[in-house]
Regions:
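Short, hydrophobic/aromatic-rich segments at coil-to-beta transitions
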Residues: 273-279, 415
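A conserved FAD-binding loop/helix module that cradles the flavin
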Residues: 532-550
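N-terminal glycine-rich phosphate/pyrophosphate-binding loop and immediately adjacent elements
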Residues: 1-130, 135, 140-151, 304, ...
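FAD cofactor-binding and catalytic pocket of flavoenzymes
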Residues: 81-111, 115-116, 121, 139-140, ...
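Short, glycine/acidic-rich hinge or "gate" loops at secondary-structure transitions
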Residues: 39-41, 160-172, 478-486, 559-562
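Conserved redox-cofactor binding core of oxidoreductases
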Residues: 54-86, 90-101, 106-107, 115-121, ...
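Glycine-rich loop(s) and the adjacent beta-strand/alpha-helix scaffold that form part
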Residues: 23, 27, 34-53, 235, ...
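A glycine-rich dinucleotide-binding beta-alpha-beta segment and adjacent secondary-structure elements
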Residues: 201-208, 226-229, 264-267, 411-424, ...
Length: 562
């Protein structure tokens, strides 16, 4: 079957590409390897506690057998189990001494259903970092190139947040921010008084606080502050492919969706320097088929897209499609997590907060920006969370009887956690390859993921732990516990970098518009395109790059240049 465009993957990147291409009048096929999911119908966000098995916990034996890796994600529960793959059915290879956690889900909408919804822009501190300190290659774009596209995707997605005027964290098109609670306001006041170059602000998140007519026309409503977001939101209050981009694409009449279709490889026509076809395997019947289009967007997620490229070998690309540079699969990055500190606060016992706010607070990067005293390059930011302990704290306390139960009716002490997100440097030996002898049940070679942190990440983590503990202590917190070892790569679920953008085809896979140097009608806009990781959550950047690349591709098609 022939289309104007094929988009592989329906998550945050694929959804945006499909929306933009369809809006430009292109007949677009969206290929999703997982099952079809119907927005609202297939969510458990309205399930009452007694309707969810085992008090929303997955039995330990089931976790160990089927979800050993997926269950390490904080969003994993009985009510969200449907959004994660069974590790037992979707294996991959990773060294025991250098483990990588590949956390994923196969279904329409992908991880746009379960993402953390934190939305921050990269700045020129990020886009110029590689060139300035010599780690990796230079980004082929700067902030000015992508800023209008940040504007575009923020307005459509709906981002709540507060403007702060920081060069390292550019402001955006914000809906009204959610409020900080009393403890966070006190912490903000103390941190900013002690450290004038540091800032505490509410987390910028993809939640509608005041829906616009465009949001309402798509059936989206305001956030109800229930904080069961990872189950899927029947109100459409947070941005996902299912609540926003795919409905918008479907309204054009130009979108065709195929689910349960696993991409086996991309065929290449050397004479035309083009992808000539997309071969897929039906996940249920294992029958094969092929689709053709004038342009192909690969948005299957970083590791899955890398797997497809490496599997698409040919006489002209013996090590994988678009891989003359030997870069495909290399420079895998994730954010440095498992860092920070936590503590309890003795005050504010007469204060509480309203609802279950779906975001925390944010303390943007300052080291090697406004405070140039790190013994490492790059930096980190903190995402913070605070609240009062509830009745369930009784499980860790000694007590029985009416008096004990009565005491638990009163909220407990305040606590706060500063969760660090640090930048990981791009290194060639952090790599995704195909296993030489093992394949999945559809005959596709398994990926082998070999990735570890280096000395720069370890020094960065030590500083983050120390700073977090010091800021909590200065603000009057007690029982402060700094974090220990860095979590294994993959735990941030921000994997990126394996088909990076760059100026030079000899050292990169993609040009400044996410177009493959070696294959004129192939574009890649998921996390694999990232040239460095920055310190902020990357999803908003994926959205902006996807919208930008899709419109550039549409322009090239209109002019006959591809």
């Amino acid at each position: 079957m022939n289309f104007d465009a094929i988009v592989i993957g329906s998550g945050i990147s694929g959804g945006w590409v499909a929306k933009e291409l369809c809006a430009r009048g292109l007949k677009t096929l969206l290929i999703e390897r997982g099952r079809r999911v119907d927005h609202k119908v297939d969510y458990l966000d309205f399930a009452t506690p007694w309707e969810v098995s085992n008090r929303d916990m997955v039995p330990e034996d089931e976790q160990a057998e089927h979800y050993a890796i997926q269950s390490t994600c904080s969003a994993f529960s009985a009510a969200t189990r449907q959004w994660w793959v069974r590790d037992s059915e979707h294996p991959y290879v990773t060294p025991a001494e250098r483990p990588f956690s590949w956390i994923r889900g196969y279904h329409l909408g992908g991880r746009s259903i379960t993402w953390g919804r934190q939305t921050y822009r990269l700045s020129d501190y990020d886009f110029s970092a590689n060139k300035l300190d010599g780690n990796g290659i230079d980004w082929p774009i700067r902030y000015a190139d992508i800023s209008p596209w940040y504007d575009r995707v923020e307005s459509f997605a709906g981002i709540s947040g507060a403007s702060e005027g920081l060069e390292q964290l550019p402001d955006g098109q914000f809906l009204p921010p959610l409020p900080l609670n009393c403890l966070e306001l006190a912490f903000k006041q103390k941190v900013e008084a002690d450290h004038p170059t540091r800032r505490v602000t509410v987390g910028r998140c993809a939640h509608l606080t005041e829906p616009t007519p465009e949001h309402i026309a798509l059936g989206r409503g305001p956030c109800q502050m229930r904080n069961v977001c990872e189950r899927g939101c029947g109100y459409g209050a947070y941005f996902s492919s299912l609540s926003a981009t795919l409905p918008a694409a479907q309204k054009t009449g130009n979108l065709t969706i195929v689910t349960d279709a696993i991409v086996e490889r991309l065929d290449y026509d050397h004479a035309k320097r083009r992808v000539s076809g997309v071969r897929v395997i039906d996940a249920r019947t294992r029958s094969g088929s092929s689709y053709q289009a004038r342009v192909v967007f690969l948005c299957a997620s970083t590791i899955a897209s890398t797997q497809i490229l490496l599997a698409s070998r040919s006489e002209y690309f013996p090590t994988g499609l678009a891989n003359r540079s030997d870069v495909v699969g290399r420079y895998l990055m994730d954010h440095v997590v498992g860092i920070g500190a936590a503590g309890t606060h003795p005050g504010f016992l007469d204060r509480y907060y309203y609802g279950r706010r779906p975001t925390g607070f944010y303390l943007p990067r300052y080291v090697n920006v406004t405070e140039n005293d790190g013994d490492f390059v790059r930096g980190f930011g903190f995402q913070g969370y605070s609240g009062r302990s509830g009745w369930d704290r009784g499980a860790d306390e000694v007590g029985v009887g009416a008096e004990f139960k009565q005491r638990l009716r009163t909220p407990g002490r305040w606590d706060m956690r500063l969760v660090g997100f640090g930048e990981m440097l791009p290194r060639a030996d952090n790599r995704v390859t195909l296993h030489e002898s093992r394949a999945d049940k559809w005959g596709i070679p398994l990926v082998n993921i070999d990735c570890t942190h280096g000395e720069n990440e370890r020094r960065l983590a030590e500083r983050a732990n120390r700073d977090a503990a010091q800021m909590l202590a200065a603000a009057g917190f007690e029982n402060i516990v700094p974090n220990g070892n860095i979590s294994p790569p993959g735990q941030a679920v921000h994997e990126m970098g394996t088909a990076r953008m760059g100026h030079d085809p000899a050292t990169s896979v993609l040009n400044r518009y996410n177009q493959a140097h070696d294959v004129s009608n192939l574009f890649i806009t998921d996390g694999s395109c990232m040239t460095s990781s920055g310190t902020v959550n990357p999803s908003l950047t994926y959205m902006a790059l996807s919208a930008r690349a899709a419109n550039h591709a549409a322009d090239l098609l209109a002019s006959g240049d591809i």
